């Protein structure tokens, strides 16, 4: 069974007196930095110096949160603990140019995703600790739950333990952002990276979007109205996922009709059959042997031509046009944003 840690297992004193630099102020960065500050820790934020309206707005948002913004290099030089929350595809470049030159013996490097460490894009020196604290929710929820006095579950891992206290630091960090209120599971950089990518590709993002599109297209091509197809294959998905999120698959099945449950048992395995499972296995192999990471890094090196083409192609799909029209009839959706 997985090993779990809670508030009682963590000691914030392990971070007291240290300067924590959070690199980035995006989804996770803004949440983690503010939570750490409100936990009584000394936090700074590393960003690009303002050069346009967007970067100036981000810089000012850090100031408005009562935190000192600095350039990434300045923050790295001032910090004892450096939490890198930049996009995967830019982390290595920024690390090599603006963080690595300022590392000192006994510093700690933190991450919330293991991509760059696991795939060798960032190779830390032997004289630093390397740990991961990965909240299992978007940043806005990390922040919202902390403010409510609660927290979101997370993962914790140690890749390199120079000081002999890397795990204590990781647990203190998890406590500082509120994750140990809910509980954190011990893992490894390899396990977190490979399972996270697999979940995104085969289920949460790639799997779900292709399943929804395939269902929508099947109904439309069979002569049904696109609006009806949208409701059946896209809109109602949230209702089912919310039930599973709340109480698992059994609770979802308890909550639906017997007709729907029978169709679930008998037709689901036909749709997600051996061919789909084999494709999942192949996707996992591509992740494990580094093929996916290599392809994604190369795509970024050449300016993302395929990524941008696929993004444009999917934005122009009929389901997006129909969905935008139907969501315009649902004013309550705007109230939840």
Curated annotation (Swiss-Prot):
Pathway in which the depicted protein is active: Amino-acid biosynthesis; L-isoleucine biosynthesis; L-isoleucine from 2-oxobutanoate: step 2/4; Amino-acid biosynthesis; L-valine biosynthesis; L-valine from pyruvate: step 2/4
- Identify the residues that bind Mg(2+) 2: 196, 232, 236
Catalytic residues in the record: 113
Question: InterPro entries from the entry?
Answer: 6-PGluconate_DH-like_C_sf, KARI, KARI_C, KARI_N, KARI_prok, NAD(P)-bd_dom_sf
Write down the chemical reaction(s) this protein catalyses: (2R)-2,3-dihydroxy-3-methylbutanoate + NAD(+) = (2S)-2-acetolactate + NADH + H(+); (2R)-2,3-dihydroxy-3-methylbutanoate + NADP(+) = (2S)-2-acetolactate + NADPH + H(+)
Query: Which keywords does this Swiss-Prot/TrEMBL entry list?
Result: Amino-acid biosynthesis, Branched-chain amino acid biosynthesis, Magnesium, Metal-binding, NADP, Oxidoreductase
Q: Where does Mg(2+) 1 bind?
A: 196, 200
Give all residue intervals belonging to the KARI C-terminal knotted domain.
Answer: 188-333
E.C. designation(s): 1.1.1.383
Residue ranges of domain KARI N-terminal Rossmann in the record: 2-187
Q: Where does NADP(+) bind?
A: 25-28, 48, 88-91, 139
PANTHER family from the UniProt entry: KETOL-ACID REDUCTOISOMERASE, MITOCHONDRIAL (PTHR21371:SF1)
Functional note: Involved in the biosynthesis of branched-chain amino acids (BCAA). Catalyzes an alkyl-migration followed by a ketol-acid reduction of (S)-2-acetolactate (S2AL) to yield (R)-2,3-dihydroxy-isovalerate. In the isomerase reaction, S2AL is rearranged via a Mg-dependent methyl migration to produce 3-hydroxy-3-methyl-2-ketobutyrate (HMKB). In the reductase reaction, this 2-ketoacid undergoes a metal-dependent reduction by NADPH or NADH to yield (R)-2,3-dihydroxy-isovalerate.
Q: What is this protein called?
A: Ketol-acid reductoisomerase (NAD(P)(+))
- Species: Syntrophomonas wolfei subsp. wolfei (strain DSM 2245B / Goettingen)
Report the gene name: ilvC
């Amino acid at each position: 069974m997985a090993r779990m840690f809670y508030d009682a297992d963590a000691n914030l004193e392990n971070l007291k007196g240290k300067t924590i630099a959070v690199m980035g102020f995006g989804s996770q960065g803004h949440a983690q930095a503010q939570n750490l500050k409100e936990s009584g820790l000394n936090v700074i934020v590393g960003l690009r110096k303002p050069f346009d309206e967007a970067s100036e707005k981000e810089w000012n948002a850090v100031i408005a949160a009562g935190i000192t913004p600095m350039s990434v290099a300045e923050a790295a030089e001032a910090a004892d603990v450096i939490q890198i929350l930049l996009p995967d595809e830019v982390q290595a470049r920024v690390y090599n140019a603006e963080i690595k030159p300022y590392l000192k013996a006994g510093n700690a490097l933190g991450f919330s995703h293991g991509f760059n460490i696991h795939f060798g894009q960032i190779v830390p020196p032997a004289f630093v600790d390397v740990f991961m604290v990965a909240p299992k929710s978007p940043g806005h929820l990390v922040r919202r739950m902390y403010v409510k006095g609660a927290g979101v579950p997370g993962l914790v891992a140690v890749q390199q333990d120079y000081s002999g206290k890397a795990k204590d630091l990781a647990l203190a960090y998890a406590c500082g952002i509120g994750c140990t209120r809910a509980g954190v599971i011990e893992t490894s950089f390899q396990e977190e990276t490979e399972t996270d990518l697999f979940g995104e590709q085969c289920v949460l993002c790639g799997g779900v979007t292709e399943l929804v599109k395939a269902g929508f297209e099947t109904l439309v091509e069979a002569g049904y109205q696109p609006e009806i197809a949208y409701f059946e294959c896209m809109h109602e998905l949230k209702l089912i996922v919310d039930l599973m999120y709340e109480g698992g698959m059994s609770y979802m099945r308890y909550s639906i009709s017997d007709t729907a449950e029978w169709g679930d048992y008998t037709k689901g395995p036909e749709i997600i059959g051996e061919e789909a499972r084999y494709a999942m296995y192949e996707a996992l192999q591509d992740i494990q042997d580094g093929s996916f990471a290599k392809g994604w890094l190369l795509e970024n090196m050449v300016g993302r031509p395929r990524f941008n083409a696929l993004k444009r192609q999917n934005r122009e799909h009929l389901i997006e046009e129909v969905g935008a029209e139907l969501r315009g009839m649902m004013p309550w959706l705007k109230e939840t944003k």
